Design a protein with these regions (language model features):
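Pyridoxal 5′-phosphate
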Residues: 1-355
C-alpha cells in the first residue's frame, strides 16, 4: 500500500501514475481543457459542499443572490443554506410546471445584477427531466453570473461536454457511472478555481507551511487535502472506459426505449400517478398508485425480487411542490431489458391487487 504524491520509491510512483492517469481520463471524458480543472472528491455531495464553501468565501456577501431550482437534490440546497447563514446572501428558487419543466420565464426574471451563481441539476433525480442547462448557462453569463451543473444524473446516461455546455462548474459521482462509491469529481474552469480558497487544510494541498503563514499547492491539488482514494479513482477510470466502450449514445437510446415501454405498461394500472412527464426524460420513473403508501409498494416489490427507491428521494422541496410526502421510483440502466420490465409489471400488478 503506497501513497500518491509522497514517495520517490517505485510503489508510490506507480500509484501516482495510476491516480493521475485517472484524472486525465476524466478530463478527456468531460472534454475539460486541463487536468488542473479536475478535482477528486468523495462524491457529488462533497463537490457541491466544496463549491458552496469556497465560492461563498471568495464571492458572496450580503445582498448577493444565488439561484437554485425547485427540483434540486438536498446536496444542492443545504450547502447553500449553510453558507447563507455565514455570508448573508439571498437564495432564490426557479419554479416548475406540473409536468416537471422549469419555468424559464421565471428564471429570466430572477436573474439580475445581484446574481452571482446559478446552480441547476442537468437531470432531476426524481422527475428524469433533462434541463436546458446550456441555454440557462448562457442566460446566467449574460447577467454576469457563474453557472454550476449538478451532473450526477446526467453523466452516466448521455454524453456531457463541458465546453459545449460552457458551465463554470460540474459535479458527478463515480458510483452513478458504475464505478466505486466514495469517489466524485468537481470540474471547474481553471481561472475560476484559481480564485477560490481551499475547502480543507492538511497534507499535500500545501506548498510551504510555517507557524506564521501557509502557501498552497497549484491546482487541482490545493483542493485535495489528505490521502485520496487512489484505488477508487482508478476504478472510476475503468468505469469510464466501460461506458465509452458500450457507447453513451447507445446507452441513451436503449434507456429511452426502456422508459417508454415501462411508462406505457405502468399506465395500464388504475390510479397510476406519474411525476415528471416531460418528453425526452431519462430512465427514472417516479409514481404513486392511488392511496397505497410508496413504502408498502417498495417493501412488497422487494419480496418479489424488485429493488426500487421509495421516500422523498433527498428532494423534499420537490415533494412539497408535487403535493406528496413521498413517491416510489423505478429506474433503468444499460443492463436492463424489456423482459425485466414486463416481469416488474407482473409484480407491480400483483402488489396493487393486494390493496
Amino acid at each position: 500500500n503506497a501513497n500518491v504524491h509522497r514517495g520517490i520509491h517505485m510503489l508510490s510512483q506507480e500509484a501516482t501514475a495510476l491516480h493521475e492517469a485517472a484524472r486525465e481520463r476524466v478530463r478527456s471524458f468531460l472534454n475539460a481543457r486541463s487536468t488542473a480543472e479536475i478535482v477528486f472528491t468523495r462524491g457529488t455531495t462533497e463537490s457541491l459542499n466544496l463549491v458552496a464553501a469556497s465560492f461563498s468565501q471568495a464571492f458572496l456577501r450580503e445582498g448577493d443572490e444565488v439561484i437554485v431550482t425547485v427540483m434540486e437534490h438536498h446536496s444542492n440546497i443545504v450547502p447553500w443554506q449553510l453558507a447563507r447563514e455565514r455570508w448573508g446572501f439571498t437564495l432564490r428558487v426557479v419554479p416548475m410546471d406540473d409536468e416537471g419543466r422549469l419555468d424559464l420565464e421565471a428564471y429570466a426574471a430572477l436573474l439580475n445584477e445581484r446574481t452571482r451563481l446559478v446552480c441547476c441539476c442537468q437531470v432531476s433525480n426524481v422527475l428524469g427531466t433533462v434541463n436546458p442547462v446550456r441555454e440557462m448557462a448562457r442566460m446566467a453569463h449574460d447577467a454576469g453570473a457563474y453557472f454550476l451543473v449538478d451532473g450526477a444524473q446526467s453523466v452516466p446516461h448521455f454524453p456531457v461536454d463541458v465546453q459545449e455546455l460552457d458551465c463554470d462548474f460540474l459535479t458527478f459521482s463515480a458510483h452513478k457511472i458504475y464505478g466505486p462509491t466514495g469517489v466524485g469529481v468537481l470540474y471547474g474552469k481553471e481561472a475560476l478555481l484559481e480564485q477560490l480558497p481551499p475547502y480543507q487544510g492538511g497534507g499535500e494541498m500545501i506548498a510551504r507551511v510555517t507557524f506564521e503563514h501557509t502557501t498552497f499547492e497549484r491546482l487541482p491539488f490545493k483542493f485535495e487535502a489528505g490521502t485520496p482514494d487512489y484505488v477508487g479513482t482508478h476504478g472510476l477510470a475503468a468505469a469510464i472506459d466501460y461506458v465509452e466502450a458500450v457507447g453513451l449514445d447507445r446507452i441513451a437510446v436503449h434507456e429511452e426505449v426502456l422508459t417508454r415501454h415501462a411508462m406505457a405498461r405502468m399506465a395500464e394500472i388504475d390510479q397510476m400517478q406519474f411525476y415528471g412527464t416531460v418528453p425526452g426524460k431519462t430512465s427514472v420513473i417516479s409514481f404513486n398508485v392511488g392511496q397505497i403508501h410508496p413504502m408498502d409498494l417498495g417493501t412488497l416489490l422487494d419480496r418479489l425480487g424488485f429493488a426500487i427507491r421509495t421516500g422523498h428521494h433527498c428532494a423534499q422541496p420537490l415533494m412539497a411542490r408535487c403535493g406528496v410526502e413521498g413517491m416510489a421510483r423505478v429506474s433503468f440502466a444499460l443492463y436492463n431489458t424489456e423482459d425485466e420490465i414486463d416481469r416488474f409489471m407482473e409484480a407491480l400488478q400483483r402488489v396493487v391487487r393486494m390493496f
